[in-house]
A protein has these predicted regions:
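A short, N-terminal "cap"/entry segment at the start of jelly-roll beta-barrel domains
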Residues: 1-62, 70, 77-78
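Conserved short histidine dyad/triad with adjacent acidic residue
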Residues: 60-81, 91-106
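Short, conserved beta-strand element in jelly-roll/cupin
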Residues: 82-96, 101-102, 110-121, 168-170
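A short secondary-structure junction signal
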Residues: 99-102, 148-152, 177-178
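Conserved metal-binding segment of the jelly-roll/cupin
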Residues: 129-151
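A short hydrophobic beta-strand segment most commonly corresponding to one strand
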Residues: 136-138, 155-177
Length: 178
């Protein structure tokens, strides 16, 4: 199941391989105020994204959006991936995420290999995560996940833009051992 928490508290997960350490360095750089990566993301216009290659088959989709102006079709939907593990880091803003095991979700659109995407029907009983700046959510192939949500407790952030980095890492690079 998904892993989430403050980036600073999850550092031990990246110590297993040199490639994961490269990923961790990128994520820390993105959060470092004033760094080139941090400024690149914070300077994105609303509703834009920029892709950055990280090597070893990894890449980051740096993006900004504001949910207040999102069309219904742009709001969160449940998805999972077969080839990549998602590392979603909030750089600025507050966003809600939902997650549920893929066995508890009904497939709406079958696997699209080109997009590495399975889309699911909405799930009413899913875990809800509040992600603020510095929070990292890691979603694996068995996690149907949806972002771009707001909970009642932080509705006041709805009009503020969200700046984030979504790193796609080939699942073969991830050595998950507790």
């Amino acid at each position: 199941m998904a892993i989430f928490g403050e980036l600073g508290s999850l550092g031990h997960l990246f110590k297993k391989t040199q490639v994961l350490e490269i990923l961790h360095e990128y994520l820390k750089d993105v959060m470092q105020k004033g760094s080139k990566a941090n400024q690149r993301i914070l300077n994105l216009a609303t509703n834009t994204e920029f892709q950055v290659p990280l090597g070893h088959g990894m890449f980051s989709i740096e993006q900004s959006y504001c949910l207040e102006h999102a069309k219904e079709s742009e709001k969160g939907f449940f998805e999972s991936h077969k080839k990549y593990v998602d590392f979603q880091l909030i750089v600025k803003g507050v966003e809600g995420a939902k997650a549920v095991g893929i066995n508890q979700a009904a497939i709406k659109n079958p696997y699209d290999e080109k997009r590495d995407l399975i889309v699911y029907e909405p799930v009413s009983e899913a875990s809800f995560l509040r992600l603020d700046a510095g929070m990292l959510a890691i979603f694996f192939e068995n996690d149907a996940h949806a972002l771009r949500f707001y909970g009642e407790s932080f509705e006041k952030y709805r009009a503020e833009p969200i700046f984030k980095a979504v790193v796609k890492a080939p699942k073969g690079l991830i050595k998950l051992k507790l």
